[in-house]
Amino acid sequence: MEPSKLFIMSDNATFAPGPVVNAAGKKTFRTCFRILVLSVQAVTLILVIVTLGELIRMINDQGLSNQLSSITDKIRESAAMIASAVGVMNQVIHGVTVSLPLQIEGNQNQLLSTLATICTNRNQVSNCSTNIPLVNDLRFINGINKFIIEDYATHDFSIGHPLNMPSFIPTATSPNGCTRIPSFSLGKTHWCYTHNVINANCKDHTSSNQYVSMGILVQTASGYPMFKTLKIQYLSDGLNRKSCSIATVPDGCAMYCYVSTQLETDDYAGSSPPTQKLTLLFYNDTIKERTISPSGLEGNWATLVPGVGSGIYFENKLIFPAYGGVLPNSTLGVKSAREFFRPVNPYNPCSGPPQELDQRALRSYFPSYFSSRRVQSAFLVCAWNQILVTNCELVVPSNNQTLMGAEGRVLLINNRLLYYQRSTSWWPYELLYEISFTFTNSGQSSVNMSWIPIYSFTRPGLGKCSGENICPTVCVSGVYLDPWPLTPYSHQSGINRNFYFTGALLNSSTTRVNPTLYVSALNNLKVLAPYGTQGLFASYTTTTCFQDTGDASVYCVYIMELASNIVGEFQILPVLARLTIT
């Protein structure tokens, strides 16, 4: 074997040759140098990449900044355009909702004033039907059908002594005569009034005539208003009109009645509703009367009765209150079979299981006194521009929003619609609703009812239906006592307590006695002013308020059925009083 070239053996010792040691050091140096070079290159590459990234970011930021600047400029331009448009829209809204109505109202008042002057002065040749125009005194025009108070603040009230004025309501003229069921409507230009004149005591199913009048508000020398009668119609044609409702319409009055010569209970027991009459009485002595058959009447109703309280002329439509008995197997009867409304007085609630109270509330709509028909409220709606050629429509509210049907009144105040419903069923408090209609050219119109919670006083009622009852039960009791709202009702919390209204109540829980003028809030009576002697018998009352814009005085006319010991069972009396508000 050839000896190793790396080692030389001498005396058993091994020695590493010098040339071999130098080669190893060079190899280590080269390795370190290569690592260093690679590291420097790597660091350089990283720095280049970072630098390029930063440059790219700066370039992008500059572009984005330019884009944002452009977008910001466009937003500012749009904001300026929107602000300009909003300003124009605000001007339009203010003009339409404030300026234009005031201007129209001013023009209307000026026109009415001019018309009154022309009609009064042109005695030789006149286009007017008489020398006295059918136009209220200008002092009252702007104060009719307006809320007297609109600030929702707390107020105090006082009712002045009844003012001495000529009565615009005639009384019976014989001991066995009877005048009953007053209906009164005050419009911007004139007023309309009607009542039933019953020939044999107060049995209205036998034979009766209908008294209708129209007139204007004028100012007396004493400074307070007077109801001046300009036209009278006495409908004595053999038709036994009953439960008539009146409404002021352009140039006259509209009256809705039904004709029947049988007992009310017999009407409910039948299957075909009695004749419905719509009568138009104009200032030029023209009378137009039609028998109407409103859509939805036949096949659904056993009977339909006008609501007694006045109706309204609104958006070129006549709207009257109505109620009656629904046939159980009819379309309307089936649709409403499970509907009921059970209000609760939170200050004096009825105790008992809610499910049981609900069942009792449902049963209250079907009194056996009326052959267990569902007693339902409704509204008769007629298009004014086709009043002589087309039929009217029955608009029926949901019984989930109203109590058992009863007499009522439709009010139009500040262009807001309200509905008074007599508390004929178990609920003893005043019933007042805000209502809104949805009219359709084809198909069924609808109405939404929003109950206003009033707990300040109760009406008289018999037996288990007295004014002290607060629990659902079957009742046919109570009495018609409509209120006049002095303020708008607001659904905002905290201010509803300042909703005020006035009227004439009967101050007893069981008997129709003690007529009393009042002003009330939702939960408490503010003022009580008894009328007549203690124990005086009375019945229906209807109230209308208005303002003299000349001196800001507020007047209310309380029309009351009062017992008479001289002529007839009742005498209908209009009591005019001044209402002071502080």
Curated annotation (Swiss-Prot):
Glycans are attached at residues 284, 329, 400, 448, 507. One of its GO terms (biological process) is virion attachment to host cell. GO terms for cellular component: host cell plasma membrane; membrane; viral envelope; virion membrane. It is a single-pass type II membrane protein. The keyword Chaperone does not apply. InterPro entries: Hemagglutn-neuramid, Hemagglutn/HN, Sialidase_sf. It catalyses: Hydrolysis of alpha-(2->3)-, alpha-(2->6)-, alpha-(2->8)- glycosidic linkages of terminal sialic acid residues in oligosaccharides, glycoproteins, glycolipids, colominic acid and synthetic substrates. GO terms for molecular function: exo-alpha-sialidase activity; host cell surface receptor binding. Gene3D superfamilies: 1.20.5.110, 2.120.10.10. The keyword Glycoprotein applies. The chain crosses the membrane at residues 35-55. The record marks 180, 242, 264, 323, 369, 407, 422, 512, 540 as: Binding to the glycan motifs of the host receptor. Its EC number is 3.2.1.18. It comes from the Viruses. Disulfide bonds join 178-202, 192-253, 244-257, 350-471, 382-392, 465-475, 545-556. Keywords: Disulfide bond, Glycoprotein, Hemagglutinin, Host cell membrane, Host membrane, Host-virus interaction, Hydrolase, Membrane, Signal-anchor, Transmembrane, Transmembrane helix, Viral attachment to host cell, Viral envelope protein, Virion, Virus entry into host cell. It is found in: Virion membrane; Host cell membrane. It holds the Pfam family HN. It is an enzyme of class 3 (hydrolase). Attaches the virus to alpha-2,3-linked sialic acid-containing cell receptors and thereby initiating infection. Binding of HN protein to the receptor induces a conformational change that allows the F protein to trigger virion/cell membranes fusion. Binds to the glycan motifs sialyl Lewis (SLe) and GM2 ganglioside (GM2-glycan). Belongs to the paramyxoviruses hemagglutinin-neuraminidase family. The C-terminus (head domain) is involved in binding the cellular receptor. This is Hemagglutinin-neuraminidase.
